Design a protein with these regions (language model features):
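Positively charged N-terminal leader segments that act as targeting/secretion signals
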Residues: 1-10
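Phosphate/pyrophosphate-binding catalytic cores of soluble transferases and nucleic-acid-acting enzymes
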Residues: 10-328
Length: 328
């Protein structure tokens, strides 16, 4: 581990002796971000995103950045809540968990040094768990012979291979939320294979003391919001957004790698499916994604995390007061 990274850990340990961090998690369409932004405005906080796709610039509508949520009116004044780890990478690159963990520690310590309160907010459970538990991760090099041997295998077979590797590793990484394409599954197999061949202690980095808030949304309401939001995003130009990325020269397979909106809209733009087929398949995929997110969060609870669930339909003021009571 580089010496400068070790030095940052000492600062991190010092920063961790302060107030508990607040983590706000929940499935897609549960309304996490407005809660995090409002809370930050009231406690002098800054929001750290835990979303594996919002790191990419110019991928705004499809990833649901909703940056307007960070602009609030407080006491008749307009304020912008600081946010982090959004728009930090170029489309076409592949941001990974190892990079996120390092970026999180840097941002977390900077917020603490300035006397502000960090609020981790997102739906990528693997990212959240990795930083809260301080999992030791390593950058995994490409294994071209392995990739060549996996090329052409269907996603179902790749998923079975990954499940077997995870069982051998005792790994909590790479659930099906993160491997919804063959390219992503092959990379996950590559990582799990490397970790199996190069075992390291799972916990070497400092964990983060955090109170965890879950935004609990009724299944039927969640499904209704997902469908309504998808229609709105398409009306707001999501297809044009993906088309612009393709015109930049970003390969279609790279956009498909990002999954969900970018996968299905790219398939539509490359004439693999009709518009109606794209909408129906994408709608189903997002519903399945939300279900898998909840499965991950329930798994976190089984692994010892305490999540305080708050009803998504409560008025914002009640949500904020409830979180403050738990935090203080």
């Amino acid at each position: 581990m580089p010496s400068d990274f070790v030095g940052r850990f000492f600062l991190f340990i010092f920063a961790s002796r302060m107030h508990k961090m607040i983590t706000i998690l929940g499935p897609t369409a549960s309304g996490k971000t407005p809660v995090a932004a409002r809370l930050a405005s009231e406690i002098g906080g800054e929001v750290i995103s835990a979303d594996s796709r919002q790191v990419y610039r110019r991928m705004d509508i499809g990833t649901g950045k909703d940056l307007d949520d960070f602009t609030l009116t407080v006491n008749h004044e307009t304020i912008t809540v600081p946010y982090h780890l959004i728009d930090i990478r170029e489309p076409g690159t592949k941001y990974n968990l190892f990079e996120y963990q390092q970026d999180f520690y840097d941002v977390y310590q900077d917020i603490r040094r300035r006397g502000k309160e960090p609020i981790l907010c997102g739906g990528t459970g693997l990212y959240i768990e990795a930083v809260l538990k301080g999992y030791k991760l390593s950058p995994v090099p490409q294994n071209q012979p392995l990739r060549d041997s996996l090329e052409g295998k269907p996603l179902t077979e790749l998923t079975e291979m990954l499940t077997e590797l995870k069982a051998r590793n005792g790994s909590v990484m790479h659930n099906t939320t993160d491997v919804d394409s063959c390219q992503r599954a092959i990379r996950a197999i590559e990582i799990e294979t490397y970790n199996l061949e190069h075992p390291t202690p799972r916990r070497e980095l400092p964990s983060v003391d955090s109170i965890i808030i879950g935004i609990d949304i009724d299944r039927d309401l969640r499904r209704e919001k997902i469908t309504r939001r998808l229609q709105k995003r398409l009306e707001e130009g999501m297809v044009d957004e993906v088309q612009a990325l393709l015109r930049e020269g970003i390969p279609a397979e790279d956009l498909i790698y990002y999954g969900l909106e970018y996968k299905f809209v790219t398939e539509y733009l490359t004439r693999q499916v009709t518009y109606d087929e794209m909408f129906k398949r994408l709608e189903i995929a997002i519903h399945q994604f939300a279900k898998r997110q909840m499965t991950w969060f329930r798994g976190m609870e089984r692994r010892g995390f305490v999540i305080h669930w708050i009803d998504s339909t409560l008025p914002m003021e009640e949500k904020i007061e409830r979180i403050k009571e738990l935090w203080q």
